[in-house]
Curated annotation (Swiss-Prot):
Record's comment describing the protein's domains: Has the structural arrangement of an alpha-helix connected to antiparallel beta-sheets by disulfide bonds (CS-alpha/beta).
Tissue: Expressed by the venom gland.
GO molecular function: sodium channel inhibitor activity; toxin activity
Protein's UniProt name: Toxin TdNa7
Modified sites of kind Lysine amide: K84
Gene Ontology CC terms: extracellular region
Species for this entry: Tityus discrepans
Length: 86
């Protein structure tokens, strides 16, 4: 019984450490990756290429992805460089 409790504790600890992020994909220009004029599966395919679990074209007409690795750059309001002429 003690081993089982220890196993469960380790399992939950690993689950808490290995987190994935969700967010809008960011293009090379620093803007959200648009999906307005693209095929319906564009966002899901693009998210998969970046090792995300799934994705869709959100109401803001930008690709939103789930469960992506931390190395994938996502758009954030605080670090927004879109339209600022780098």
């Amino acid at each position: 019984m003690t081993r089982f409790v220890l196993f469960l504790s380790c399992f939950f600890l690993i689950g808490m450490v290995v987190e994935c992020k969700d967010g809008y994909l960011m293009g090379p220009d620093g803007c959200k990756l648009d999906c307005l004029m693209r095929k319906g599966t564009f966002c899901a395919e693009t998210c998969s290429l970046r090792k995300g679990k799934d994705g869709y074209c959100y109401a803001w007409l930008a690709c939103y992805c789930y469960n992506m690795p931390d190395w994938v750059k996502t758009w954030e309001r605080a670090t927004n460089t879109c339209g600022k002429g780098k």
